[in-house]
């Protein structure tokens, strides 16, 4: 779908703008580098420029501690990590030869194993990486926050896996190189290697949801927990009319008619997904049904609707919490999902606003219930990745 995240210093390679981690989750048993040396494609050597940089900030191979400017290493990460999965690759000379890497299901103790793992992920998962921030969190420690989107290319339906979290990177004070890299996922509690909870988190993301291959509103994934996802949506335009209930379809033919040519210029406009129904306030509040218009469309150039009850509306960008589910989106199911989501958000100290949206990505009349993709979205009053 989409995009990934938002930051004053940000790196983004995303399949959805999407959207869209410092280090990445891996789904392979660690392979000793002695048997599988890293391919040349990921052995790019930038030692000369990196050595000059290190000398500039006081790094040395001597046994005495150098004068450390960790802030410059933070700046280096902002420059280097965007290349995690491109042809340039990360600067391997920034890491000790013996570097400890660990995430909940992967473990390496050398730069060779670490780089080979990155290579495998690049080939099989086509990852999209976004660094939200990096900052010093200890005398010889930098913490980063990231989002990682991965498309598992070996399965026919190519599921998208989403991971968010932090990486704690330890610095060798003698060399000013990174000597450890420990990943912590937001979606699990047990982040120690080997975490069966982490493995299950991977497996459950492999399930099949039928998502049409058409345009969707652009968003960034800021955080994914065990119970919900936090997204930042870009602004978009909808054609909307009054609906009957959150799970209802009343009014759909009216808004669909607009994009099929029932407008002042008889223009046919491309269909998008999902179809939104929006409830304002509690169950007794008003309901609107909306079709999102393609991102290339501008409000000033759109044709007027033929039907007076159809309205064109600009929707401001927003940060929302989202829960995904399959099956038929009946009113009881949708309200139950909304209630559960509010409970999880409040338990995590977030402030959900009144009202919610139901996003339906498929035609329920022509799609098997167990592969339907439905989502409930609730706007968040305030959200910060610094919290």
Task: Report the location of each language-model feature.
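C-terminal and inter-domain tail/linker signature
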Residues: 2-208
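A solvent-exposed interaction/effector surface
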Residues: 193, 197, 201-387
